[in-house]
């Protein structure tokens, strides 16, 4: 079991990365689609959290597969036990600390919104099955004019998302691109 302080430091690192490095990468033309967002988050989180990751046997993996749930997480932060005598690294993973689902789109079609909403349902399923009790980060860059940057409604944020989910949002409001963090997890708000 990982110490709460470590979880809070990871949470702080993810939120700061979104508000600083991801914003800079976006405005400097380093982010084109979801995969470049994933690469950027991976790079910046490994850099920012390097010491914490090493001290706590934590690893960051893209496209991490949860076989029991039959889902791929875009990014997962996991803890490994290096003393386990197994051939496969996957068998040394003892805890999941954080899961990130990412979306990056410039379209405003119903299909785009449905893909985003499907990731919300994926996170909801992770939480409601109780098989994966960790922190969840839903990161969306939506290059379309928005009324609001939030994707979760009050019913979600007051129920299943409370204590677990943080939205990392970006979208256009009145013609300007905005980035924000909406934490429902009670940490580093």
Range-by-range predicted roles:
Residues 54-92:
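Active-site metal-binding core of divalent-cation-utilizing nuclease and nuclease-like domains
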């Amino acid at each position: 079991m990982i110490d709460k302080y470590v979880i809070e430091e990871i949470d702080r690192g993810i939120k700061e990365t979104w508000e600083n490095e991801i914003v800079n990468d976006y405005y400097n033309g380093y982010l084109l689609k979801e995969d470049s967002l994933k690469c950027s988050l991976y790079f910046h989180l490994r850099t920012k959290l390097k010491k914490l990751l090493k001290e706590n046997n934590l690893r960051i993996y893209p496209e991490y597969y949860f076989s029991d749930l039959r889902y791929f997480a875009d990014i997962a932060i996991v803890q490994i036990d290096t003393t386990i005598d197994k051939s496969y690294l996957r068998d040394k993973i003892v805890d999941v600390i954080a899961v990130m689902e990412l979306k990056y789109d410039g379209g405003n079609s119903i299909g785009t919104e449905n893909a985003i909403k499907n990731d919300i349902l994926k996170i909801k399923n992770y939480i409601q099955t109780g098989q994966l009790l960790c922190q969840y980060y839903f990161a969306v860059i939506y290059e379309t004019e928005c009324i609001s940057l939030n994707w979760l409604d009050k019913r979600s944020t007051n129920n299943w998302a409370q204590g677990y989910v943080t939205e990392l949002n970006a979208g256009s409001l009145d013609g300007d691109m905005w980035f924000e963090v909406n934490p429902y997890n009670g940490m580093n708000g």
